[in-house]
Structure formats: C-alpha cells, structure tokens
Amino acid sequence: MSASADQIQECFSIFDKDNDGKVSVEDIGACLRSLGKSPTMADIEALKTEIGAKEFDINTLKSIYKKPNIKTPQEQQKEMLDAFKALDKEGHGTIQGAELRQLLTTLGDYLSTAEVDELFKEISVDSTTGAVSYASLVNTIVSGYPLGGF
C-alpha cells in the first residue's frame, strides 16, 4: 500500500511543528514509519547522511518515500521469514534460542544484548527444547516492537 500525496503532505505537516516548511532530520524515521514504511536504523542513518542538513522539506520526503530500498512492514516480514526458513533445514518453523541470540547480536542491523533480552521477554521460548517459533518472532518484531528501528 502506498501513501497518497495528500497523506505525505499531512504527515509532513504534523512533523513541521513551527510551520516553516522544514522538518528536523531526526524525524525522518518517524515520518516514514507513519507513512507505512519500516526503515532500519542503518536506513535512517544513510538517509540523514544523504539529506546532509539538519532539516528537510516536503519534496525531500516525497523523494525518500519513493525509494524502493525502504521496505514496508509486509516486505520486511517476508524477507525475515525467508531468511529464517533458509536456516531451518528440518522445516520445523523454529530456531534455538541460543542461536537466535547469537544471530541478533552479530549480524546485519544487529541488536545490543539488552535489546535481545527485552525481545526475549516478549516472545515464547519452549521451556523443554529452547526453541523459538520464528513466525511468532517475526510477527512480534514487525508488529511494532521497538527494536533498533523496527
């Protein structure tokens, strides 16, 4: 689902607190999320560098919104599920908690140990096997659990 020009303008107006036609570059992630995108922290840092100023205007937001590398939550969910399925050689739909911790703290847009500890409080880990349903994990992350920009 794409945001309309009116929705982008409305979003911009909400973040343009003093009505000067500019929004703080620190709000770029929140703007994109409110428009249905799901930028990672790495995406946000790259956008700040690309913008190269402390503020941006509506045309910059429109241009950034159109970038295909800023995924929607649905695209991000599919990408994460595909990655977990590739690791799941036996097709059980699970990953061991210890392996998950290691992956989340070392790969890609990785999380701190404290962030992983917080995540583990929100997900279900099988007390017998130590396994985590990766579909449930992905749903938790994509549904808005505030991890590293998700």
From Swiss-Prot:
Family matches, as PANTHER family: CALMODULIN LIKE 3 (PTHR23048:SF0), MYOSIN LIGHT CHAIN 1, 3 (PTHR23048)
Protein name: Myosin, essential light chain
Keywords recorded for this protein, A-Z: Calcium, Metal-binding, Motor protein, Myosin, Repeat
SMART domains: EFh (SM00054)
BP terms from Gene Ontology: cell migration; mitotic cytokinesis; myosin filament assembly; sorocarp development
Tagged with keyword tRNA processing: no
Complex and partners: Myosin is a hexamer of 2 heavy chains and 4 light chains (two regulatory light chains and two essential light chains).
Annotated Ca(2+) binding sites: D16, D18, D20, K22, D27
GO CC terms of this entry: actomyosin; extracellular matrix; myosin II complex
GO function terms (MF aspect): calcium ion binding; cytoskeletal motor activator activity; microfilament motor activity; myosin heavy chain binding
Domain annotation EF-hand: ranges: 3-38, 75-110
InterPro entries assigned to the protein according to its UniProt record, in alphabetical order: CALM/Myosin/TropC-like, EF-hand-dom_pair, EF_Hand_1_Ca_BS, EF_hand_dom
Pfam families: EF-hand_6, EF-hand_7
